[in-house]
């Protein structure tokens, strides 16, 4: 971790004359705000130190802003009166063309923008971050008291382990993650619909048995993303000792993929020829790249869609979302790869037992009430033009939450004895927290010191905690330069070594 500090630039001290000029400029700018807009007495030190431009958007820009018509509402305020939501990851901004748009949500309206010029503007109520892109050493500092932070992270926990630690996740006030406990859950993001589970008709078992007699393995492994936190290849390699596995991807490859087929195992699309090819297998090894409650991807849902049985490792609570009580084979329910192989061979030789895993394909055989209710109630859609996507959905969630918070703050200021101030929301570990990566097979203390997985993922996990605590320290000390992160991490390490908290 300390090696990462090498080569970092240091802040250039301001000369006295320049500092005096800046202070005068800030004083004049503050003085230009009406009392009700700035309210210095109600602001903490971090906001007093920040220059608050009246607007980064000109009058002409306000007038020409487009409008995303969501559910619609009775909010008739002008664009200049609306709170602003700043998308910090511009590449995820869910509107085009342009970088600013009015959004009309279920209960209220906001301006959404990816224009970072508005970061310090008083009306910028919330900053929305994409978890994969969030870096402690690039955070928008100083953090202003009047702004909330919102996190959108639907991808693997491996993309940013900072979010799996308490000091990291509690930086955010609103969350949209794969965890059901998040404010705007994306748990079933890879399941388009109930119909997706029911179709197509599986390859007949008689055909699968014929292919087995001709040499097709009972188990398919299709992975081209190797060396991941879940260490799945280590487990599959051990499993291969006890049962035949056809592996077509780059990981543990033992069979070439036909030239007319494209490996779409890591893609979001579903090429039909490839899907038909893999549907011939009885079992699909479906091991996620990261292990975390409710983290379930296409690796789980595609085999179910195709009428194959997923042999699954990923979410520890995956059974909560399965179509019925017997839809998938959970790897962690078996004491060893050998025991799992024996069970798969048993199913391979017993058609009646195997068919029980595909009963959900029949009408009215999907009995999981939680799954059915979640699909029915979610407001966003997957490849469904009749519903908003989850980016627009979360954006509107934040917009409505912020308008409610701001209204409650105004009511409290007008009648503090009658109206309580709004409660400050803060995310916790249940919104994202994922466990320390562990070996796919065996115990960590049995691994050689030069093991590539050991040298990578456990270290990444704990270094991410250092960065989360470092950013928390930057915010606590009202720092405005995020590159000071490494200095704060070093100072905390020194304090710990001296036995100080």
Swiss-Prot record:
Coiled coil: none annotated. Belongs to the glycosyltransferase 10 family. Its EC number is 2.4.1.221. Protein O-fucosyltransferase that specifically catalyzes O-fucosylation of serine or threonine residues in EMI domains of target proteins. Attaches fucose through an O-glycosidic linkage. O-fucosylation of EMI domain-containing proteins may be required for facilitating protein folding and secretion. Its main location: endoplasmic reticulum. The keyword 4Fe-4S does not apply. GO terms for biological process: positive regulation of protein secretion. The chain crosses the membrane at residues 11-31. PANTHER family: ALPHA- 1,3 -FUCOSYLTRANSFERASE, ALPHA-(1,3)-FUCOSYLTRANSFERASE 11. Pfam families: Glyco_tran_10_N (PF17039), Glyco_transf_10 (PF00852). Residues 1-10 are cytoplasmic. The gene is fut11. It catalyses: L-threonyl-[protein] + GDP-beta-L-fucose = 3-O-(alpha-L-fucosyl)-L-threonyl-[protein] + GDP + H(+); L-seryl-[protein] + GDP-beta-L-fucose = 3-O-(alpha-L-fucosyl)-L-seryl-[protein] + GDP + H(+). This is GDP-fucose protein O-fucosyltransferase 4. Keywords: Disulfide bond, Endoplasmic reticulum, Glycoprotein, Glycosyltransferase, Membrane, Signal-anchor, Transferase, Transmembrane, Transmembrane helix.
């Amino acid at each position: 971790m300390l090696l990462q500090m090498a080569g970092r630039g240091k802040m250039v001290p301001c000369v006295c004359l320049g500092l005096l000029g800046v202070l005068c400029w800030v004083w004049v700018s503050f003085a230009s705000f009406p009392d009700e807009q700035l309210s210095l007495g109600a602001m903490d030190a971090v906001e007093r130190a920040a220059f608050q431009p009246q607007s980064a958007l000109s009058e002409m820009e306000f007038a020409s802003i487009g409008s995303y018509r969501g559910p619609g509402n009775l909010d008739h305020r002008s664009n200049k009166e609306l709170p602003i939501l700043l998308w910090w990851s511009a590449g995820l901004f869910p509107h085009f063309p342009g970088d600013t748009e009015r959004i009309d949500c279920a209960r209220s309206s906001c301006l959404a923008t990816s224009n970072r010029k508005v970061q310090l503007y008083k009306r910028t109520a919330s900053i929305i971050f994409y978890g994969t892109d969030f870096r402690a050493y690039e955070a928008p500092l100083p953090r202003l008291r009047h702004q909330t932070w919102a996190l959108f992270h639907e991808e693997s926990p491996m993309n940013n382990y900072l979010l799996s630690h308490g000091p990291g996740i509690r930086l955010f006030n609103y969350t949209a993650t794969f965890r059901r406990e998040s404010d705007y859950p994306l748990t079933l993001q890879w399941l388009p619909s109930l119909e997706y589970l029911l179709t197509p008709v599986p390859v007949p078992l008689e055909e699968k048995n014929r292919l087995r007699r001709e040499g097709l393995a009972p188990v398919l492994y299709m992975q081209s993303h190797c060396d991941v936190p879940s260490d799945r290849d280590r487990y599959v390699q051990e499993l291969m000792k006890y049962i035949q596995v056809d592996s077509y991807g780059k990981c543990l490859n033992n069979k070439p993929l036909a030239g007319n087929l494209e490996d779409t195992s890591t893609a979001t699309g579903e090429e039909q020829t490839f899907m038909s090819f893999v549907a011939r297998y009885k079992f699909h090894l479906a091991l996620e790249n990261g292990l975390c409650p409710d983290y379930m991807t296409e690796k789980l849902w595609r085999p179910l869609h195709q009428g194959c049985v997923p042999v699954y490792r990923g979410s520890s609570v995956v059974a909560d979302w399965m179509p019925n009580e017997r839809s998938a084979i959970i790897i962690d329910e078996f004491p060893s790869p050998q025991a799992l192989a024996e069970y798969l061979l048993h199913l391979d030789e017993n058609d009646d037992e195997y068919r029980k895993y595909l009963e959900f394909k029949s009408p009215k055989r999907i009995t999981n009430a939680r799954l059915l209710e979640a699909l029915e109630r979610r407001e966003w859609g997957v490849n469904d033009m009749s519903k908003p996507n989850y980016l627009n959905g979360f954006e509107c969630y934040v917009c409505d939450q912020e308008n409610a918070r701001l209204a409650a703050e105004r009511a409290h200021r007008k009648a503090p004895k009658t109206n309580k101030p709004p409660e400050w929301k803060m995310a916790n570990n249940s919104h994202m927290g994922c466990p320390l990566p562990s070996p796919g097979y065996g115990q960590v203390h049995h691994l050689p010191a030069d093991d590539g997985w050991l040298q990578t993922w456990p270290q990444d996990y704990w270094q991410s905690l250092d960065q989360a605590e470092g950013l928390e320290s930057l915010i606590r000390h009202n720092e405005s330069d995020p590159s000071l992160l490494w200095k704060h991490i070093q100072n905390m390490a020194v304090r710990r070594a001296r036995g100080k908290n």
